[in-house]
Amino acid sequence: GGFDHTPLFTANVGRFHQGMIVEVPLQLWSLPGTPGIEAIRDTLSARYEGCRFVSVATAEETSDHAAMLDPEDLNDTNNLRLYVFGNAETGQAVLAAQLDNLGKGASGAAVQNMNLMLGLDEAAGLV
């Protein structure tokens, strides 16, 4: 909620059977309070702090991957890694999520949710 404009989701395709990058391009002016790139990264980091399967890349890690994110980096895991790329001068940012669509995808989510509903360890049966 709170968006005046509908976000645009994009996916990357390539010659790999497993792994995925999903992107959400943002016009910073369209967000409440017109946050900067670091503010978005800080908000995501605070939200996912302590989450076992979700991590947010630091500015340095994001810079190291600016040329290319490998969709297969998280294969065979239940992990999801978030990156915030952006250009403060143009007021644009891209949120990128890196995941194994076969692990963190629907089957992994089903196991994780079942564990939570049954009061089991969230990671039971997951890689």
Enumerate the predicted regions with their spans.
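NAD(P)-dependent Rossmann-like dehydrogenase/reductase catalytic/cofactor-binding core
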Residues: N79-V127
